Amino acid sequence: MAEIKIDSKIFQERISHFATAWKNDLRSKDGLFNGAQSLVVMMGKVEEVPEFHKNNAIHFWLLGYEFPTTLMLFTLDTLYILTTAKKAKHLEQLKGGRFPIEVLVRGKDAAENEKLFVKLTDKIKEAGNKVGTIAKDTSRGPFVDEWKKVLAEHCKEVSQVDISAALSTYAFAVKDESELRAMRTASKACVALMTPYFLDEMSNILDAEKKVKHSTLADKVDKKLDDTSFWKTVQLPSKGKLPSDLDPAQLDWILGPAIQSGGKYDLRFAGESNDDNLHAGIIIAAMGLRYKSYCSTIARTYLVDPNKAQESSYKLLTLIHNTIIKEIRDGMTAKEVYGRAVGIIKSKKPEMEKHFLKNVGWGVGLENKDPTLVLNAKNQRVLKDGMTLIINTGFQDIENPHPQDKNSKVYALVLTDTIRVTSSEPVVFTAEAPTSADANSFFFKDDEETEPAPKKEKKDSRVGAVATKNITTTRLRSERTTQVANDDIEKKRREHQKELAAKKQREGLARFSESTNDQNGGEVKKFKRFESYKRDNQFPVKIKNLEVVVDSKNSTVVLPIMGRPVPFHINTIKNASKSDEGEWSFLRINFLSPGQGVGRKDDQPFEDASAHFVRSLTFRSSDGERYNEIATQISNMKRDVVKKEQEKKDMEDVVEQDKLVEIRNRRPAVLDNVYIRPAMEGKRVPGKVEIHQNGIRYISPLNAQHRVDVLFSNVKHLFFQPCQHELIVIIHIHLKDPIIVGNKKKTKDVQFYREATDIQFDETGNRKRKYRYGDEDEFEAEQEERRRRAELDRLFQGFAQKIAEAGRNEGIEVDMPIRELGFHGVPFRSNVFVQPTTDCLIQVVEPPFMVITIEEVEIAHLERVQFGLKNFDMVFVFKDFTRAPYHVNTIPVEFLDQVKDYLDSSDIAYTEGPLNLNWPTIMKTVTADTHQFFADGGWSFLQADSDDDGGDPSDEESAFEMDEDEFDEESESSDEGSDFGSNASDDEGSDAELDSEDEGEDWDELERKAKKRDRESAMEEEDRGANKKKQRKR
């Protein structure tokens, strides 16, 4: 006990805070202390298997140590501690603080000890008629029994009330920084044992097909706790290390390690790992550690050769787990958290609700499980910033529809993480151990050999889309197997598209189950009131002259009507014009009114469209120059107001970002010598990008104030574009909400790039070339450029990965374009190369950039797909029907099948047609009443065009085709009517001449007539030539 050092500062801070909360609670009617004016916390003898409950938790919270056979009596102004002499020595140092403490020493004399107990009971009675105790107190031993006997005898009129919830709320639930630091360390230690250590051991066993018992594997993990060298060298999944000040001696087990597989699962993890062998199926591992008395727990499910049903169930579990973690906030109740989880199950797979656990977690800290903070369907406890929770989601007793053996008939799934509640998204202490299906699924069985997919037919770009189907590349039927395979692929694609179209129709009817009447689509415009002046004294001074006054400051035109100045806000005026008639000039001011039906103003809202409106006012004056000036002022004011409103509208979706939290204690990760797009104002020079705690920052070297901050919470997609086939290497960030970059440039895309090529010089004829024959120098230059490009790719990809790791709590992942699936097209004005990624279709090399998120696409339509055209267009319609459809035009027709394959594999329903459609009109119809649109068939009107054009390939090869019987009859009749067989011409005129051959003239006669006609024609030409000469002479 000589090494015991109690931190008196922390003791005083915590007990003062606790006493203040207690006093405030007593003032409320339904306080958590239940009106207790004194509190008793008992500790019995040391237990063989130590368990942490609220009685020893209060010891650790206040003193940092557990003092067995010790009684604590709290009153509102003093703490009394009854303990042995040895322990009392360590408590003496706490005296003299702000909160008084009195230490009572008990010895071996039973009578003296009883007097001390009686003294404490007197203090209880002095405090009040209620004493707070811990209801489920597990303390045991003679010391406890003696106290209970004295308390029962001397405090008969004092009632005992439970203070468990009060201790949890005011002492244990909300952690300070030192407590959170201990929990983070415990969590990292859990992650280190789970992955890489347990994961590697399990993988090796399964890979080698060894027979290892659960208990044996658990013991192996257990022994690592005492392996000091392991804790010094272990590397976490993020390649990071454990804290340098980690003391392995202060680590202790609170759970497991528990390993389960082979159909026997207990998600309470109440018992030890059994002696069954590790089974290659669903494997669950759970473990919990305590560090400096603070607990953390982790559990993961690993799927070995799972079937589709198991994968589907696990993906549902990860969806539930990640969703509730993301949505937990300060102020939510425990039952709301559980309700969110059940709501997801009911919407996705209602049949799984009966297998779901009865709670989704509990409070954790000094206690492994706080029974007053269980996240179930009944608990009304409010979560607060600083609380730490175990989030434990799982399904149990699930029947396997396709068991691979007798041990796979039933399985369970569970995920457990330790988190900290904040006012925004929680901090997940155990996040470094992955939970995704991709990371936790293992496939050891060899997949069945599949036949290689037939190569696509290379198409001639000079031939139209439809015409290519009429050209065969083979002569013999035996060579046409590829054609048949392509037809099968096309058939499967058509069937899949029909399924997708039906699914879209169902989803549309479900999303818009009631008439929307513009509530989803075109935004219903509201009548806006404009107030020029609030009081009379705000009118311009010039109104005294009863003349037309243009008040630019208040965007108002004041007109004299019936001897009184009447203000008209500029938004009520349509336009103003000046005209001359004789010696008079006329100023005509037109106002906005319903029913004008001009341009985009037809839907201009009015408070009462049936009221009487003044459409125009005309003023007459002999001062034409003044009226000309007034008309110009009104026009300029109108233009400025419209421009201002447009700028305001453009900036509506620009949100003010939180401040970037800079890294102060170390140098941030930096990528230097990069350019930014959109470019900053001023000279174009390369800057640097830094990764900080909650985002990244670009800094210009010219001015430190010229910087761009991008927060991880605002990152929607992160792309790395290698410099292969390009002149630059790129890190591209697509944002959720636009930000302002440079000189008031609004953008949703921020890009950092570096040029991949240096300036090349032609060294032909220089001295070096004199003595070097061949292309050695060109070869060296090419090699050097290849090395430089590879180094740039490695540098930028590595930095992109660092950004993703820093923003992993926001779900940021690096995505790369797949060049093999790319195609040329014109999304704006220039022809660019568009490439798909995992989640998007992008073009980030040339501005303006193009980023289309596949999940946001409702349907795609291919336009101008018809015979003879060398290219086609593609239109994306988004699920948010208020967004304008996105066009990618002039795609070469040889990419048609490739584009269709990409859309089909991305589960995007597509249609095709021969013409360009009027999409603004179509979307206006959709948004006018979306429910009615889907009730009338939805997008099926596009599908109808596709079906008419698409037909069966056999129909396109010939416009006329006979069946075999008709063909036989036709052959027989043609043989009977002609002696020339199948080689005879089908032309009727030729047949008539041949049939009458015996009645015609012979060859000599025909030749003679021909010569005569030649002579006659020659004479006619001579006569014509002579006549021309005569005419010239005249």
Swiss-Prot record:
Gene3D superfamilies: 2.30.29.150, Creatinase/methionine aminopeptidase superfamily, Creatinase/prolidase N-terminal domain, FACT complex subunit Spt16p/Cdc68p, Pleckstrin-homology domain (PH domain)/Phosphotyrosine-binding domain (PTB)
Composition bias type Acidic residues, residue spans: 945-978, 985-1005
Subcellular location: Nucleus; Chromosome
InterPro entries xref list: Creatin/AminoP/Spt16_N, Creatinase/aminopeptidase-like, FACT-SPT16_Nlobe, Fact-SPT16_PH, FACT_SPT16_C, FACT_SPT16_M, Pept_M24, PH-like_dom_sf
SMART domains attached to this UniProt entry: FACT-Spt16_Nlob (SM01285), Rtt106 (SM01287), SPT16 (SM01286)
GO molecular function, one term: nucleosome binding
Annotated Pfam families: FACT-Spt16_Nlob (PF14826), Peptidase_M24 (PF00557), PH_SPT16 (PF24824), Rttp106-like_middle (PF08512), SPT16 (PF08644), SPT16_C (PF21091)
Biased composition (Basic and acidic residues): 452-462
An example Gene Ontology biological process: transcription elongation by RNA polymerase II
Recorded coiled-coil stretches: 480-507, 625-659
Entry GO CC: FACT complex
Main location: nucleus
Keywords carried by this UniProt record: Chromosome, Coiled coil, DNA damage, DNA repair, DNA replication, Nucleus, Transcription, Transcription regulation
UniProt-annotated stretches for the region Disordered: 444-464, 502-521, 942-1034
Known function: Component of the FACT complex, a general chromatin factor that acts to reorganize nucleosomes. The FACT complex is involved in multiple processes that require DNA as a template such as mRNA elongation, DNA replication and DNA repair. During transcription elongation the FACT complex acts as a histone chaperone that both destabilizes and restores nucleosomal structure.
Subunit structure: Forms a stable heterodimer with POB3. The SPT16-POB3 dimer weakly associates with multiple molecules of NHP6 to form the FACT complex.
Family indicated by similarity: Belongs to the peptidase M24 family. SPT16 subfamily.
Protein name: FACT complex subunit SPT16
Gene source species: Gibberella zeae (strain ATCC MYA-4620 / CBS 123657 / FGSC 9075 / NRRL 31084 / PH-1) (Wheat head blight fungus)
Native organism taxonomy: Eukaryota, Fungi, Dikarya, Ascomycota, Pezizomycotina
